[in-house]
A protein has these predicted regions:
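SIR2/sirtuin-family catalytic core signature
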Residues: 62-136
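Short cysteine-rich clusters marking metal-coordination/redox-active sites
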Residues: 17-21, 40-41
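Short, surface-exposed amphipathic charged segments that create phosphate/polyanion-binding patches used
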Residues: 20-27, 130-135
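A general structural motif
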Residues: 30-36, 52-63, 81
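Short, small-residue-biased leader/transition segments that mark boundaries at the very start
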Residues: 1-4
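Catalytic cores of enzyme domains
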Residues: 10-12
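Conserved beta-strand scaffold positions in the cores of enzyme catalytic domains, especially
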Residues: 6-8, 51-53, 99-101, 116-117
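Short Cys/His-rich local motifs and their 1-3 flanking residues in nucleic-acid-associated proteins
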Residues: 22-24, 43-46, 79
C-alpha cells in the first residue's frame, strides 16, 4: 500500500475540470498551463482550474477527514489555520499523533502539541525529513 498519503484539499494547479463537473479532471501541461475562455472538455463544456475558490464547498473534506483520523503523522504545509473547514482537520488527529506545521510565518494555533518548522515549504520539508529520520 501507499505509505505516504496526501490529499489535495483545495484542488491542483495542473488540473482542470468542466464548470458543470468538478469531479472529472483533466491534466494541464506544465509547459502551457493557461486556461482560456473557449477551452472545453470533450463534451463541449467550458474548462476551469481544478481549484476551490473562496466561498465554494470543499468537496475533498470528507476523504481528508478519513485520512487524518487514520494517520500516523500529520503534516500541514503553508497555512494560517484560520480558514475553515480545512483548519478544522486538526480536530481529527488522534491524541498523541505527531503534528508538524511548516510555514515561514508565525501561526497562532489553538493546540499546544503542534511542532512548528518556520521555513518555506521546500526547506521545511527537508528539515521535517531529517527530524523524522532521527526520531523513527
Amino acid at each position: 500500500g501507499d505509505v505516504y498519503k496526501r490529499q489535495h484539499l483545495h484542488g491542483e494547479l495542473l488540473k482542470a475540470c468542466s464548470v458543470h463537473d468538478l469531479n472529472t479532471t483533466y491534466d494541464i501541461s506544465p509547459e502551457n498551463p493557461d486556461l482560456h475562455i473557449g477551452d472545453k472538455d470533450p463534451h463541449g463544456v467550458q474548462l476551469r482550474p481544478f481549484i476551490v475558490w473562496f466561498g465554494e464547498a470543499v468537496p475533498m473534506i470528507a476523504p481528508a477527514i478519513r485520512l487524518v483520523e487514520d494517520c500516523d503523522i500529520f503534516v500541514v504545509i503553508g497555512t494560517s489555520l484560520n480558514v475553515y473547514p480545512a483548519a478544522g482537520l486538526l480536530n481529527y488527529v488522534r491524541h498523541g499523533q505527531p503534528i508538524y506545521l511548516i510555514d515561514p510565518k508565525e501561526v497562532k494555533a489553538y493546540r499546544n502539541d503542534i511542532r512548528f518548522i518556520r521555513k518555506g515549504a521546500s526547506e521545511g520539508v527537508k528539515e521535517l525529513k531529517e527530524l523524522l529520520l532521527q526520531n523513527h
